Amino acid sequence: MANVDDVHTKPIPAFYCCYLLRSTVRQTSLYIGSTPHPSRRLAQHNGVSRGGARKTANDKRPWEMVLIVEGFMSRTAALQFDTIYTTWAWQKPGKSRHLGDDDNTESAREKGKTRPRGPARSLKGHLENLHALLRSTYFSGLPLRVRFFADDVHQLWRVWSDRIDGFIPEHIKVIPDGSCFENRQPGIEYLRVGSVEHIQVDYSKIHSYLEKTTFQLDDPEDLQCKVCQAPVVPKEELVLVCPQTRCYCVSHLLCLSARFLDSTKDRGRLIPISGKCPGCHKTIQWSLMMQELSFRTRGAKELQAILRKKKRGDCRVKDVPEKDTDDVGTVTAECCDFPESVGGSIEGPGDASDESTHDDVRLDDDWYESLGIESDHEIADWSESHPAMPTRVEIVIEDSDCDNTG
């Protein structure tokens, strides 16, 4: 495990999830793990690439990833959540203090039945324990999503959910994806990705957001906190910027946090899930702002590399007068004025084959804190009005080593 001081100086990872595998050869064989890169990890389990786990080898292959739980926040975001431990708790629920009597309801059990919770070997047992984890006092406050890729597993989940008295918090979304029957309920369709391979696991979704905040805070003169009206000093204070494209609202972290918490119905909550921006009054996700803040304050070299790469991309598409043939295809020095000491592109997971790796800047491989997923509404808004160049960020994070097959 990484040194605590080192881990807490790294940006929040772009993606981290827990997953459930099922053997397509022996469907009673299940495996639970955690990873920052689901498609890469699935390929490892199936022997396509090196890695994987001993209990997912040979006669039980190929495996399918039937569901993932995504949206984990880092400890630096104050949610006190360790993704490795969460996986362990899901695998060994009988030994987890989070699956005791502190579920989110007083009678969160299957109607008409009471029995001690033992090791979950069946698919139904794993789903029961996952449901209980999401209802528990500790985990119900996290901005999580449960994404199903197999329709039969999703249907079993729905049947179990209908039979139990306990309810998962409204902010925890259940997304039928992959082969699941398309669910037309509002707010779900735009979340579908289609397959494990299409899950976005890098920082590219927040590149334009990072660019916006960097340039907005570069000249802090006359900037004021929208909540307390006091001046903001980005170099000395933790400052948040609204992720909405056309909103330039700036707030102190503590001021905005207090405002969001004051507006929630859950008076016992310590960390916000979301809230309305005091500037544009649109709902924004706390986890998205925390990811941007951590990258801006802890990943200075990586941030400058993103900006430099984006600047180069803008230079390539810069209009050149047709009659001035001597300048066609050239890029002026003034157009790309970033310091030469700044690194270049940042690779994404599995993209090490890129030819232009001589100036890449990479994050260290000794950190694995988890991240809450970004708001897709906000990301879609950014993508339409600020098309980003295909820069990539590599996150080298250890996968879970815990084996649990039935």
Swiss-Prot record:
- Look up the record and report any one GO term of the cellular component aspect: Slx1-Slx4 complex
The UniProt record lists the EC number as 3.1.-.-
Q: Which GO terms describe its molecular function?
A: 5'-flap endonuclease activity; crossover junction DNA endonuclease activity; zinc ion binding
The segments labelled Disordered in the record are 32-57, 93-122, 341-361
Do you know which PANTHER family this protein is assigned to?
STRUCTURE-SPECIFIC ENDONUCLEASE SUBUNIT SLX1
How it assembles, according to the record, is: Forms a heterodimer with slx4.
Listed name of the protein? Structure-specific endonuclease subunit slx1
